[in-house]
């Protein structure tokens, strides 16, 4: 990584920081004001979380609370377990909810299986208000499982349907059906409401996911930073991030939504609608415990229409719960892959989706070690950008050769800026040099370099994959934990950033420069220091990529310096030009 690349990285980083500040979602209003505006905009909307709190506090008779559905508020809970090739899920007859979801191939930081469902009462239920003022959360009702089997084991393309049902004597019926496949993290979720058209207020019901995803990483604060709720509607995503403690964040836009989801750093739970929806509901809060660790709790819902003139309403959904792996979430066919953060939509994301990930997957099919894959990838990118590096080096060498003339002119016309600019432009023109030629090739490859940053920062493929001294390429390769924290640097010492700083230092010594000796000396130490600080808290896989990119840059720069020579730049000496003699008249 040459000096121009580093300068470009710094400049674009500053631009990105400014962009994020300008384009960041507006901070939600305080709860009371937000609720007032929401009620004015959607008078019939159901405030799900408030109802949950209210219901949990009530000690009322089930009939008073749920009306004629109160008879199902008392019962005996039974559990049904489904084991597939990828996970083990547990369903409960209380609420027909999903109680646990334990992946087989992905463990927590202790290398133990963990339950992605954080809500102790389970998740996935229906919400609706009745015309007599009752608010029904089916998660509190006991369903009848339409199977006597308690354990299922399926694999491959085999599927199993598990229906739950409650029905009243007057013909009202709620049926919830799960459809699991043996080889997919995505499963079907179907609802059937019969006789509720004139029973439900607002002609609307909601399918709800309750709770954030369980923490699985050692650095819970970092995991919380990368956790949020998001919806895809109107061709774009809407994100809700509970970024501050003791604040409640809410969004409930109207419109046809393809999906609404909750994610952590490496996992996601998404509700995907197979038909038109009325909008989404998202709510989140950030909580801390006594140890100052953070957990972000979310609730999301899809809103669906329930016409009063229809006796039966059937709705189909799918639920994806599992790793945030690009190919897997893209396979849902719902554009759920949009929830993976690849940076700017029209700048870095295309590089990530159509270049970096396909090449990474190709290498993954032929190489077992992710560390080796990263090294090969760095070599590939260096070879691809070689023409740009060559063009940049040639331009910088020409600029370096012009420095004596430029300094002389600057001294000669230091009191005449206009004349100085004109003379410098003339020299550039005569020498055939573009002053931006040294940095323009670097700027062109900046989107690719930043796309690499986003991909390696969020790639689950690197999670818990070791290489050399690093036990996990998705976290810093710390070799020493400090008893204190250094501002910007952190509370640990990582090896790869130190090696990167050394590589950047030597790479700069090989790179042609147009700067003065004092400037060169300053930059020689500034950029290695910046790399040391910046990458100390980054995933070691990302650091390994940039380290090897710099090592290959050193080799490439050495080769260029040995095989190319600077063509002498010959300028006309105007002071020695003689006037042509006048032609004699005959």
From Swiss-Prot:
Write out the entry's keywords from A to Z. Answer: Cell inner membrane, Cell membrane, Chaperone, Membrane, Protein transport, Transmembrane, Transmembrane helix, Transport
Q: Name one Pfam family in it.
A: YidC_periplas
What's any GO biological process attached to this entry?
Answer: protein insertion into membrane
A GO cellular component term found in this entry reads: plasma membrane
List the subcellular locations: Cell inner membrane
- Give the transmembrane ranges: 5-25, 371-391, 436-456, 486-506, 522-542
Q: What is the top-level taxon of the source organism?
A: Bacteria
So what does this one do?
Answer: Required for the insertion and/or proper folding and/or complex formation of integral membrane proteins into the membrane. Involved in integration of membrane proteins that insert both dependently and independently of the Sec translocase complex, as well as at least some lipoproteins. Aids folding of multispanning membrane proteins.
How is this protein named in the record?
Membrane protein insertase YidC
**Lineage of source species:** Bacteria, Pseudomonadati, Chlorobiota, Chlorobiia, Chlorobiales
Gene that this sequence comes from: yidC
